[in-house]
Regions:
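Active-site mouth of glycoside hydrolases
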Residues: 1-223
Length: 223
């Protein structure tokens, strides 16, 4: 059986750069293991430039296809530490919410104007902005490139390909993915299916989950 917990900052703690603290990582993993937690849900990494007060940093993907190698190393290190403790991970790749970039950063990168920051501009403005994502082919294409890059990588500490690593319990498409409008429900469902198929084409060995909030994730339409 699995007993899980959220541990979004695992890749950052595993880094030897800004934000990294491997001693703390070891202590936290040892403690979690000691109380029976054996599965951690982890953010692969944040998207977008650093310096946005409401966003996790340091960022992993600082520009489209441009990666902070210290965070990639942190992710690899974190995964290897889980492996040594016989623990597993659920790795999520995107985010509906601004705290790690996600939808809003992909929209900004693909020419939809500056990303809206809810702490500054308000939540209604944010949700109006990010509802463009499910119908933006250019934003979705940038995310597809990110999926290819992450899923296809090899861990530098143990030379195990991610697709072959039993430490991964599941990939998740994103954190709490939402359509953000009724008219987006069908495009959103198609996008989710496309991403799941993309991941499975790269990695037939692991589960793919949505991380949906259920009714909130489908505009209260569970049909």
């Amino acid at each position: 059986y699995f007993v899980g917990a959220n541990f979004w900052y695992g890749a950052i703690l595993g880094s030897e750069g800004e934000g990294g603290n491997r001693e703390r990582l070891h202590k936290e993993l040892d403690f979690l293991k000691s109380i029976g937690i054996n599965n951690l849900r982890v953010l692969v990494g944040a998207d977008g430039e650093n310096g946005i007060k409401t966003r996790v940093e340091p960022s992993l993907q600082v520009a489209p296809g441009v990666y902070n190698d210290t965070i990639l190393a942190g992710l690899d290190y974190f995964m290897n530490e889980l492996r040594e403790r016989d623990m597993t991970a659920v790795l999520y790749l995107n985010n509906s919410w601004e705290w790690s970039g996600g939808y809003s950063v992909y929209l900004q990168w693909s020419g939809h104007g500056d990303a809206v920051v809810p702490a500054v501009d308000g939540w209604p403005a944010y949700m109006e902005y990010v509802k463009q994502f499910p119908q933006s082919d250019s934003a979705k294409a940038l995310f597809a490139n990110h999926v290819n890059y992450i899923v296809s990588r090899t861990n530098r500490y143990n030379q195990i390909k991610y697709v072959d690593d039993p430490t991964i319990m599941s990939w998740q498409i994103g954190n709490e993915p939402r359509a953000f409008s009724d008219e987006n429900k069908e495009p959103f469902a198609r996008w989710m299916a496309d991403v799941a198929a993309q991941i499975k084409s790269l990695d037939p060995n692991h589960m793919v989950s949505s991380s949906s909030e259920g009714s909130w994730g489908c505009e209260m339409d569970m049909s």
